A protein has these predicted regions:
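Positively charged n-region of N-terminal signal peptides that target proteins for export
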Residues: 1-4
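Short S/T/G/P-rich N-terminal loop/turn motif that feeds into the first structured element of a domain
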Residues: 18-192
């Protein structure tokens, strides 16, 4: 598992998947937890993830809630890594959070995270995918641009985003815009 995670991180830094089969912009689906870390001990951080991943709790969590998890390195912004947890909908996220919170293995991983990262730098938020094009699961490199859209201006912002993406054609692989539904007062959307 450790070699696989390291391979994914390295290949993510070195490769680009620029084209996907469906580049038309459409309504998105899914609910996403973004967890931002400033990791000081990458090996210990990944080891904590591996220990949790090999637990019966992790198996139950994924099997029952459909949680899909990714670890990404990040450049800029004061955080070195993102853990992204994707769920099909809010009900599955709630089920996943309940299972995750009930396990000693997840508590042990969180303690290890505190020992391998700057805990006061940690933050998270939950988003819902508003618009998407292509299949982001096929990409290995992402931009994650966080923006604050003025309250009441989301429709015009989304229209401008559609115009931008329509004007670029197939220049991107996959892209989309997420609305932050809770967890962060500084960011209202993230563009990926």
């Amino acid at each position: 598992m450790k070699k696989n995670l390291i391979y994914l991180i390295v290949s993510g830094l070195l490769s680009f998947n620029l084209f996907s089969s469906d580049s038309s912009l459409r309504p998105g689906s899914g609910v996403y937890e973004f967890h931002f870390f400033n990791v000081t001990n990458p090996e210990g951080f990944v080891s904590a993830i591996e220990a949790f991943d090999s637990s019966s709790c992790a198996a139950k969590w994924r099997n029952e809630s459909g949680a899909n998890v990714g670890l990404y390195s990040r450049m800029g912004g004061g955080h070195s890594h993102i853990i992204l947890v994707a769920y099909e909908n809010y009900d599955m996220m709630q089920l996943g959070q309940n299972i995750f919170a009930s396990c000693s293995a997840s508590s042990e991983m969180n303690v290890a995270f505190a020992n391998t990262s700057v805990s006061e730098d940690y933050y998270n938020y939950v988003t819902e995918l508003v618009l998407e094009a292509g299949d982001w699961r096929l990409n290995t490199v992402f931009s994650n641009i966080e923006v604050k859209v003025k309250t009441g201006s989301q429709p015009s912002y989304l229209e401008a985003y559609k115009q931008l993406t329509n004007s670029t054609g197939d220049a991107f692989g996959s892209y989309g815009i997420n609305r932050v539904v809770y967890g962060n007062k500084y960011v209202s959307h993230n563009v990926v």
